[in-house]
Amino acid sequence: MEDERIKLLFKEKALEILMTIYYESLGGNDVYIQYIASKVNSPHSYVWLIIKKFEEAKMVECELEGRTKIIRLTDKGQKIAQQIKSIIDIMENDT
């Protein structure tokens, strides 16, 4: 199980999905599956599959508001996203 969670973080789309949730939450925005799907240019079904895996890894929580699921990072997910952001910053500043 641990191995699968680590592999999940190194998939490009999964990383893009996680960081989309992170950046949107920084702006105080609620994040929905359909929004993520359009932002990362992936099918709704694929985004939902990745979100479920993030949920199993306790990186996100899904909250139902009416018929819409809102996706939020857990503390663990927030810490992981912040570390990834630090790596991105290092790579972007390495010129």
Curated annotation (Swiss-Prot):
It comes from the Archaea. InterPro entries: WH-like_DNA-bd_sf, WH_DNA-bd_sf. This is Uncharacterized protein AF_1382.
